[in-house]
Amino acid sequence: MTRKIVDLARSCGILYLMLFIGEWIAHHLNIGIPASIWGLLLLFLGLTFRIIKLDWVLCSASLLIRYMALLFVPVSVGVIKYADVLFSQMNVLLLPNIVSTFLTLIVVGLLSDYLFSLSSFSHLRKKVARKQAEKA
């Protein structure tokens, strides 16, 4: 039990440290990127370059993920509270969302078509087609 408490404290401490450093960066750079994004970027880089071990943050990260739905309740209430502002700005909000969705679909479709046309994928497709032909 004591070990779990120590792991949770260390895990929360690391996450808060990343957030604190993100706050410092956001305050001093002042380029419009929120401190939480800086903190997440630092956490990602720390995990990627193995400066921070996954086991060190796993305890509090899994706890936060478990209760993530509860963390979104205040945001949802805020959206409902300011629904009139959202509806008045709907044309500004809706157009970029629709355009970015279609652009994402097009780029992913073209990229997947290109990747499947490569020789390694076409070789695998031919192999699967032969196996299906043998079964029939």
Curated annotation (Swiss-Prot):
Domain of life: Bacteria
Predominant place of localization: membrane
Keyword Transmembrane: yes
Locations listed in the record: Cell inner membrane
Record keyword Cell cycle present: no
InterPro entries named in the record: LrgA/CidA (IPR005538), Uncharacterised_UPF0299 (IPR022957)
Residue ranges crossing the lipid bilayer per the database entry: 5-25, 29-49, 67-87, 92-112
Coiled-coil features, chain-numbered ranges: none
Cellular component annotations (GO), alphabetically ordered: plasma membrane
Keywords noted in UniProt: Cell inner membrane, Cell membrane, Membrane, Transmembrane, Transmembrane helix
Its membrane topology: Multi-pass membrane protein
NCBIfam families: PRK01821.1 (NF002494)
Family from the record: Belongs to the UPF0299 family.
Protein name: UPF0299 membrane protein PM0880
Species this protein is from: Pasteurella multocida (strain Pm70)
